[in-house]
Curated annotation (Swiss-Prot):
Record keywords, A-Z: Ribonucleoprotein, Ribosomal protein, RNA-binding, rRNA-binding
Job of this protein: Binds directly to 23S ribosomal RNA and is necessary for the in vitro assembly process of the 50S ribosomal subunit. It is not involved in the protein synthesizing functions of that subunit.
Organism lineage string: Bacteria, Pseudomonadati, Pseudomonadota, Alphaproteobacteria, Rickettsiales
GO cellular component: ribonucleoprotein complex; ribosome
Gene3D superfamilies: 6.10.160.10, Ribosomal protein L20 (1.10.1900.20)
TM regions (residue ranges): none
Source species: Anaplasma phagocytophilum (strain HZ)
A Gene Ontology BP annotation from the UniProt entry: ribosomal large subunit assembly
Organism domain of life: Bacteria
PROSITE patterns reported in the protein's UniProt record: RIBOSOMAL_L20
Protein's name in the database: Large ribosomal subunit protein bL20
CDD domains noted in UniProt: Ribosomal_L20
Similarity-based family: Belongs to the bacterial ribosomal protein bL20 family.
GO MF annotation terms: rRNA binding; structural constituent of ribosome
Pfam families for this protein: Ribosomal_L20
Length: 128
């Protein structure tokens, strides 16, 4: 049987790692061992932060909804409770977008949510 030398596969593996590490600073972009370590850490961060991004966006949506609901005298929890009582099928992402882009529609939802909770909706005067 012929002897198998691993030079070709090793070179290919090293090239792949170096290509993925393109754009890194220092030795991490062209030294295989440093690039491999940096790449493993980068992929671990990417995996972790893909999950963290979902939490971050949900927090952002809640902050935006709370701020917009506050203009109508409602707390976030009261607003969301009223929305669920009214069977309004909008998720937090859509409600947050409406709070930013379509204030008129959000106002109608806020009034409906306030009525469902048995609260009176107070419209705050805005300076803008």
């Amino acid at each position: 049987m012929a002897r198998v030398k691993r030079g070709v596969t090793t070179r290919a593996r090293h090239k792949k790692v170096i290509a993925l590490a393109k754009g890194y600073r220092g030795r991490s972009k062209n030294c295989y061992r440093a690039a491999l370590q940096r790449l493993e850490k980068a992929l671990a961060y990417a995996y972790r932060d893909r999950r963290a991004r979902k939490r971050d966006f949900r927090s952002l949506w809640i902050v935006r909804i709370n701020a917009a609901a506050g203009l109508y005298g409602l707390r976030y929890s009261e607003f969301m409770h009223g929305v669920s009582l009214c069977s309004i099928g909008l998720n937090r992402k859509m409600l947050a977008e409406m709070a930013v882009r379509d204030k008129g529609a959000f106002e109608k939802i806020a009034h409906a949510a306030a009525q469902a909770c048995g609260r009176t909706c107070v419209v705050a005067q805005s300076n803008s």
